[in-house]
Amino acid sequence: MTDTTLAPEVTLSDLPLREELRGESAYGAPQLNVSVRLNTNENPYPPSEALIADLVETVRATATELNRYPERDSVELRDALADYITHQTGVQVTRENLWAANGSNEVLQQLLQAFGGPGRKALGFQPSYSMHPILSKGTQTEFIAIPRGADFRIDMDAALAAIEEHVPDIIFVTTPNNPTGDITSLADIEKIINAAPGIVIVDEAYAEFSPSPSATTLITRYPAKLVVSRTMSKAFDFAGGRLGYFVAAPAFIEAVMLVRLPYHLSALSQAAATVALRHRDDTLATVAKLSSERIRVAARLEELGYTQVPSESNFIFFGKFTDQHTAWEAFLDRGVLIRDVGVSGHLRVTIGLPEENDSFLAAAAEISGLNL
């Protein structure tokens, strides 16, 4: 095989790219070969042997029909998701309330395709999930960033004023928030929904780590305005499987069916996610371990003099640094990869295995005396 790249002389600036994409950078966390990787909020525990065995057999059976297109509407998977949501949140739902796609990013993209677009606006409270503005731009939806308060929580007075001023078609609320880990109460979410002229997407990617009630409990009260998005990439130990979903009134599922690509979710993805849901009790048992480790790590960071936002997730947002990127490099020099999310003076660390957390804390202890 040749290792000569075809047409390398053509650069991005030579292409007739959409003007609003010029100068932008592609999304992506650093993927570096280091001993301790605590930068992408994955569940560090591998799948159970029982899950792997079940997956192998299920994929083997599925492979006999790979010459055929997959089940178009993911009915079996949506049934399994509905059963999970019913038990996890206490809200009775059916497959008609569930939609699944390739990670929550595709779920959010489909919602933006259906409810955003040219001439429409999305609004979010920053810092928050960095893909919200990126997905908005990709769908030609204007994104309006409203700063959070000094404590990184949503300033409700400012939020309601911004909604009145900008009249957004879509509002994003991430709870627990990424990268800060704090939650937005149901009472505040209701205030936002009541003020919203369009739809509200509550991003609950990390909901399993929080004891707070899910926004799905509000769907019957606001069926035409509320969508709750979730993922199997975090607590579910299924980041490599790429499966996201949302819970909403059936009309929202009808809406995204208008924009989804045909057969968007492969037969293998559907089969693997259904297997993961069958073994959810084993997998979600790791949530308690990670929550306990989060408490331990947070306590030690406090002892070392770091500030942090109280977290109900599997990560901690901490500081305060004079130059957070220099501090990020200092952790990397010590073999620990964490995340610089671009927020001045702060970094984010994923909670890993106990020994990984010990390595992080050892590095944090050394760095605390460097005045970075």
UniProtKB/Swiss-Prot annotation:
A biological-process GO annotation: L-histidine biosynthetic process
Subunit structure: Homodimer.
High-level lineage: Bacteria, Bacillati, Actinomycetota, Actinomycetes, Mycobacteriales
PANTHER family: HISTIDINOL-PHOSPHATE AMINOTRANSFERASE (PTHR42885:SF2), HISTIDINOL-PHOSPHATE AMINOTRANSFERASE-RELATED (PTHR42885)
InterPro entries to which the protein is assigned, alphabetical: Aminotransferase_I/II_large, HisP_aminotrans, PyrdxlP-dep_Trfase, PyrdxlP-dep_Trfase_major, PyrdxlP-dep_Trfase_small
Keywords from the named record: Amino-acid biosynthesis, Aminotransferase, Histidine biosynthesis, Pyridoxal phosphate, Transferase
Enzyme class, broadest EC rank: transferase
Record PTM N6-(pyridoxal phosphate)lysine, positions in chain: K234
CDD domains (alphabetical): AAT_like (cd00609)
Pathway connected to this protein: Amino-acid biosynthesis; L-histidine biosynthesis; L-histidine from 5-phospho-alpha-D-ribose 1-diphosphate: step 7/9
Organism domain of life: Bacteria
Family statement: Belongs to the class-II pyridoxal-phosphate-dependent aminotransferase family. Histidinol-phosphate aminotransferase subfamily.
Transmembrane region(s): none
SUPFAM superfamilies assigned to the protein according to its UniProt record, in alphabetical order: PLP-dependent transferases
EC id: 2.6.1.9
Annotated protein name in UniProt: Histidinol-phosphate aminotransferase
Catalytic activity: L-histidinol phosphate + 2-oxoglutarate = 3-(imidazol-4-yl)-2-oxopropyl phosphate + L-glutamate
